[in-house]
Amino acid sequence: MPQSKGPFYMTTAIAYTSGKPHIGNTYEIVLADSIARFRRQEGYDVFFQTGTDEHGQKIELKAEEAGITPKEFVDNVSTEIKRIWDLMNTSYDKFIRTTDDYHEKQVQKIFKKLYDQGDIYKGSYEGMYCTPCESLWTESQLVDGKCPDCGREVKPAKEEAYFFKMSKYANKLIEHINTHPEFIQPVSRKNEMMNNFLLPGLQDLCVSRTSFKWGIPVDFDDKHVVYVWLDALTNYITGIGYDADGNSSEQYKKFWPADLHLIGKDIIRFHTIYWPIFLMALGEPLPKQVFGHPWLLQNDGKMSKSKGNVIYADDLVDLFGVDAVRYFVLHEMPFENDGVISWELMVERMNSDLANTLGNLVNRTVAMSNKYFGGVVNKTGVEDAAIDGDLKAVVTATRDKVQAKMATLHVADAITEVFTLFKRCNKYIDETMPWALAKDEAQQDRLAEVLYNLVESITIGANLLKSFMPETTDKILAQLYPANPEAGVRDFDDLATFGLRETGLKVTETPEILFARLDFEKDLKEKVEAIQEAQKKANGVTEYPQVEVKPEITFDDFEKVQFRVAKVLTCEAVKKTKLLKFELQIGDEKRTIVSGIQKYYKPEELIGKKLVVCTNLKPRKICGIESQGMIISAWDDKDNLSVLTLEKDIIEGAEIG
């Protein structure tokens, strides 16, 4: 193995334990995993940390709703989050929980240290508080009276609290950002932080709460708990052994400062303003880079349980497989702008990129090797300089192209480079036409060279795919090197060299289909609808019917229609029909009306009720009975129906309008 290029420490934001993560949340851990795997492949000694953020008022309230303790609640959710991360084949080295004993003790020490040196002081605050975001806002910061971060309702809050002196370190942070352009990426996030927060002037930050108990107690003032951001952000140092008393671990000394904090764009303020200022106050180096990635959205916007449009990773994995999901979220996310996910787009990518471009390439290559040479792949040296040279140039250049993209975290572009290699291999098959060469005895050595070139090219491509689709790489190498798949694993430095496969090795006799083509209507539609229906029921989401707006009428037109209160005197079923026959009292007259609602009501249920009827509808005969008006009902597309009744006891005959 080559010598290590040195330590590389990276983290994701720790997931908040308020519920099961959806595919938008899961995107971050897959993105981080692809970066960590690639850095390991390059030769770095990587430490990759993720975990769960487990304190706060929101969790306290959710636990109360569930009838369990906050610790039981976060234990359940943290286990579920870890299950999803493991399902996605993420190669984290540490999964930290903010309820871990070591973390909690260090947070208390950090709080006390900052208090003792005068960076934290006691005061009180008054403002508008957003419980889901656990953020306090002034009236002027609200957007249409709601939280500027999430758009939810806020409520007035006033309590005693400890505050951190943010303004003390603001100029130092501004200088750091200006002299380290790589610190905040993409650049648009940097501009946002400078212009919206730092340059206008920082307010001191509330770092404790007394209105709830589920948090780390301030040990010298146990009425207070440490506020979420000072608690959560410090996981990045406590997780690798930071000690506020100066006895930090060798691991901490090796890996800090972090090379990369990978977070969602919605929490970049906390990571590029609050976090570096906390570190400055502690006398610790700042992380080298904070990358605020975009969101993965549904077609109709950000995923939300309240919208009923959530897609979960495990549902996608059940239908498409882990690597197909990894490919999709990595490939579809631009560097800076939000990406979009839908079931239909997943099928499109599955068929065009995975089944056709990659799966078909591997299957054809293995099948032809078996058909023409009994699976033995030999290098004969019989080349077409132009065609073979172009293939080799593309293949050997791909490593450096992928590396350049990954260096700037353009992961979607990096994976596209790998698939460009596979597309070039498919073109090579069309150019060389192995089936035609096979018919000419004099071209057998040329045919063997063509198949060797294909197997070698796919081997290099599969190695470069490893960071993004690790299971698929293993499956490809198992088919190309069935006797010893490890023989197909290349050192990163060798991935720009063509021809390292030993001649005479066999491919598998039974090629495996890597990705099967799917038809959304035939294969998935019913399953997807069942998943969506189950989620809506579980989340209590109401699916509203689409409202079809009929042509407008004038007020004069509306006034022509007369609605009145009618009391049901008698009601009976009309035999051999769907009708109920009503005798109604409407003011001083009685009327007969029939209505096709027999399947929804028993006659006795309606006797004595007061209904809404249209009284000036021209009478018509229905099944031989003259109906002198219409009973007004509401119905939906699920075959539910309800006659309109009155909230208060209004005399029959009263006009409605």
Per-range role (PLM):
Residues 540-657:
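Phosphate-backbone binding interfaces of nucleic-acid-interacting proteins
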Residues 117-170, 174:
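Cys/His-rich short segments
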Residues 122, 345-382, 394-501, 507, ...:
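Helix-rich, typically C-terminal accessory recognition domains appended to large enzymatic cores
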Residues 476-557:
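Intrinsic disorder at enzyme termini
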Residues 2-50, 102-106, 156-371, 414-418:
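Structured secondary-structure scaffolds
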Residues 78-93:
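A glycine-rich helix N-cap at a beta->alpha junction
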Residues 300, 418, 454, 470-472, ...:
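Hydrophobic, well-ordered secondary-structure elements that form the walls
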Residues 2-77, 96-111, 116, 133, ...:
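N-terminal catalytic cores of NTP/NDP-binding nucleotidyl/phosphoryl-transfer enzymes
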